[in-house]
A protein has these predicted regions:
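C-terminal extensions
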Residues: 1-133
Length: 133
């Protein structure tokens, strides 16, 4: 995905990230999987390390089919910010939580169905965690 697909990365941030060689969510994940990489990118771009970590977590979630922009934001608001975190969730509980959070914050047009969440969680269990803290 293009880097701008991550919620919160507009033209200004995208320009800074692209100048540092980060054009896609894959680039971001590769460069920022480790704390050292996030610190280096923060230094190079002037973007806070906290924000870079948030975006890296979203890029991590983008590895799951069906997760992108606003849905990654919704998952984060529901307490799931990484693939590693997603794999431990009970589908019915997560569905209730994202529905509740979306009703409250209106982050997505549509909340994924329970079967969709079940597939996402199953896929999360198969993916290797890539982010270190």
């Amino acid at each position: 995905y293009k880097i701008e697909q991550i919620e919160g990365i507009g033209a200004t941030y995208a320009e800074k990230l692209e100048a540092a060689g980060v054009k896609t969510t894959e680039d971001l994940l590769e460069k920022c999987a480790a704390k050292k990489g996030r610190a280096a990118l923060a230094e190079e771009t002037g973007i806070s390390e906290k924000l870079i970590l948030k975006w890296t977590n979203h890029a991590d979630l983008f590895r799951i089919n069906g997760i992108a922009g606003q849905f990654a934001e919704l998952l984060e608001a529901a307490g799931v910010d990484t693939v590693k975190e997603l794999r431990h969730r009970v589908p019915a509980n997560l569905h209730a939580k994202v529905t509740e959070v979306n009703t409250e914050k209106n982050l997505c047009n549509r909340v994924p169905s329970l079967p969709e969440l079940e597939k996402m969680i199953a896929q999360a269990k198969e993916l290797e965690p890539v982010i270190t803290y």
